[in-house]
Curated annotation (Swiss-Prot):
This is Urease accessory protein UreD. One of its GO terms (cellular component) is cytoplasm. The lineage of its organism: Bacteria, Pseudomonadati, Pseudomonadota, Gammaproteobacteria, Pasteurellales. PANTHER family: UREASE ACCESSORY PROTEIN D (PTHR33643:SF1). The gene is ureD. Belongs to the UreD family. It comes from Haemophilus influenzae (strain ATCC 51907 / DSM 11121 / KW20 / Rd).
Length: 261
């Protein structure tokens, strides 16, 4: 099935973020929720939903999100995404494109992705950021239904994330390029520096084009100090070359990964 979700934001006359345009084909749907009573009070809080039991063989999923200047969007999902079993040679694909205009802010953390036995899932995400925009973007992947003895029973998982800063001359400057490629039949994914004995991997990328490296370094140090208190998770926090940081979390429960991220 070819499915598409496209949404954009606008700023109301009262300074609140609203949906400008919204288009979705099954199984996608988006609903708006009450705003948080904090710094995002004037932002839009929304939930991405799906009526499908999961991602099926041959699915092509396309997500397009565009934030207007000075708008803020917090986008969550309804439930876990399950990539169902597939015949050999079949696969599913998701492409996501996100555009942040000047001084816009986006928080986007979908529920964990669960890779069922014999599944193949590939995703590509490209994010373009305008001046002084802010991004909090994450993903959590489960290596299978562990209680069903599905540890690395999927065929392939790949995730490519590329983030760019938009420049005044119209060109794009690379900020982040992150690639995850899992092929259980060809890789020892339980080896040291891979997944080891953990079952869930979480990734969080934070970028704020209004902050300098010294400010980001303070955030990294504070997060590193907090992470030492977590005993059941393996957490790595790294400062990016400019404007941001990246967090990688390995754990054995989806809830624990979600909470720390």
């Amino acid at each position: 099935m070819n499915s598409k979700l496209s949404l954009s934001t606008k700023l109301s006359s009262s300074g609140k973020t609203q949906l400008a345009e919204y288009f979705a084909t099954p199984p996608f749907k988006v609903i708006t929720l009450p705003s948080y009573d904090d710094a995002w009070a004037n932002g839009l809080n929304a939930m991405q939903m799906s009526s499908s039991p999961g991602v099926l063989a041959g699915d092509l999923l396309e997500i397009d999100i565009s934030l207007a200047k000075l708008t803020a969007l917090s986008l969550n999902t309804q439930a876990f995404t399950r990539v169902q079993a597939m015949n050999e040679g079949d696969s599913a694909m998701q492409t996501t494109h996100i555009l942040l205009a000047e001084n816009s802010r986006l928080f986007y953390l979908p529920h964990p992705l669960v890779l069922h036995r014999d599944s193949v899932f590939k995703q590509q995400t490209q994010i373009e950021m305008g001046e002084q925009s802010e991004l909090i973007y994450g993903e959590i992947v489960a290596i299978g239904r562990v209680l069903n003895d599905e540890r690395f029973a999927f065929r392939q998982f790949s995730s490519h994330l590329k983030i760019y800063a938009l420049q005044n001359d119209g060109k794009k400057r690379p900020l982040v390029s992150d690639c995850i490629q899992w092929l259980p039949s060809k890789m020892n994914l339980t080896a040291l520096s891979q997944m080891e004995n953990y079952s869930h991997q979480g990734s969080l990328t934070y970028l704020n084009l209004a902050k300098n490296n010294a400010e980001i370094k303070q955030q990294v140090q504070a997060l590193q100090q907090q992470s030492t208190e977590e005993k059941d998770l393996l957490i790595g926090i790294s400062q990016l070359n400019e404007y941001g940081l990246m967090v990688r979390v390995l754990g054995c429960r989806a809830e624990a990964n979600s909470e720390i991220i």
